[in-house]
């Protein structure tokens, strides 16, 4: 699934600041930084609801950084979002993490910012990555806890559901695997 970067409000702001760093890095590294900043997006974001395992939290941040997502959100009602630094490998320095103390607060903040709420679940018939319409406006992909998936509160508040079609015996995928398969690319 390809997606054009249509909502990077920060390109000029970041561009001016990265230009001031040019004299301190090689031209090649400066080009990587310039290209990376130009591709950052806030058109899509991720909400991780009560992610228990530090390795999954770190892998989620790495996925967000790799796919150009500038900001992700976390709900921390059951546990703190605490990425394992050995797995994050510094990518947490490039992604803004917004922490919320409740699911209701997170969903309200995302709606206030103009996002539609897209819950990931294997149990609902709605859209697949191939049929998901990224052009309908900014969206937040919601991933649930490793233990129970998304909460009833997310199910009740979602605008649509995104599922990965599966035909094996397993009922669900690891949150990070699901992230990898559902995030559109710029």
Name the predicted role of every residue range.
Residues 55-56, 127, 149, 173:
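Residues that form or flank phosphate/diphosphate-binding pockets in enzymes
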Residues 4, 8-14, 18-125, 131:
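RNA substrate-binding interface of SAM-dependent RNA methyltransferases
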Residues 167-177:
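Short glycine/threonine-rich catalytic loop with a Thr-x-Gly-x-Asp
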Residues 60, 154, 179:
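Aromatic/hydrophobic pocket-lining residues that form π-stacking "cages" and hydrophobic walls in ligand
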Residues 117, 142, 178:
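A residue-level signal for conserved active-site and pocket-lining positions in enzyme catalytic cores
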Residues 123-166:
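Active-site/ligand-binding-proximal alpha/beta "capping" segment
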Residues 179-185:
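Conserved small/polar residues in nucleotide/adenosyl-binding loops
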């Amino acid at each position: 699934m390809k997606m054009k970067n249509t909502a990077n409000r920060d390109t000029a702001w970041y561009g001016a600041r990265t230009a001031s760093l040019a004299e301190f890095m090689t031209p090649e590294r400066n080009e990587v930084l310039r290209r990376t900043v130009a591709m950052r997006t806030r058109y899509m974001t991720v909400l991780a609801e009560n992610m228990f395992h530090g390795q999954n939290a770190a892998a989620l941040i790495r996925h967000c950084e790799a796919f150009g997502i500038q900001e992700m959100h976390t709900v921390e009602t059951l546990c703190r979002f605490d990425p394992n630094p050995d797995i994050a490998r510094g990518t947490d320095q490039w992604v803004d993490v917004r922490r919320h103390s409740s699911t209701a607060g997170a969903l309200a903040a995302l709606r206030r910012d103009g996002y539609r709420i897209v819950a990931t679940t294997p149990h609902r018939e709605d859209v697949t990555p191939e049929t998901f319409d990224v052009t309908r406006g900014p969206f937040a992909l919601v991933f649930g806890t490793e233990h129970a998936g998304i909460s009833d509160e997310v199910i009740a508040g979602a605008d649509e559901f995104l599922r990965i079609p599966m035909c094996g015996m397993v009922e669900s995928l690891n949150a990070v695997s699901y992230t990898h398969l559902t995030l559109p690319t710029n």
